[in-house]
């Protein structure tokens, strides 16, 4: 897809989302970001897009609210005039022993990581269809793509991210006739969570064949490749430095 003068919506404007938005803007894309609480980071991400000469908007959105997803898409279309690319990046990440997981914990993760991806895609597809096509990029996880859990304490997260892979494949089939290509990224060790110790950093590096953390730009490169392609759909691509083979 020729990216010049297209419009994208990215759910999540922190760290990786900001870099993806910047790289899309560098290729001629206007970008809308949603954010939950990180307004300053969203404003900074929008500023980077504007610095590239493209339009940018930010929208505070509670993606756990089912009605908010359609409202977000309509706001993005209203601000940018069209929608060609949807990047479902927003995620809730909770670590808790299974015995302590409540229904509220389950819903908090499933509602944002899986249901919101479905609802945003559902709202975006008609706009893409009217323009002759579009691209949807969902976000899963390298462990979910591996087909088996590797760590305890992440039941809702693992189920949600595995569901994202199934959603991606189902939407790819449903929307192919409309030239809407649907794929997913399954990140591995990209950014260390805040508070990660030096020993923990090294342990991840030692477990990764390429021997390092990837950084935001590696995800942005993957997203650009998927939205640029005209013949990849239904795929979930691991960007994990080979972590899954070790």
What would you call each of these model-derived segments?
Residues 137-163, 168-177, 189:
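Catalytic loop of short-chain dehydrogenase/reductase
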Residues 39, 60-72, 103, 217-218:
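The beta1-alpha1 cofactor-binding region of Rossmann-like NAD(H)/NADP(H)-dependent oxidoreductases
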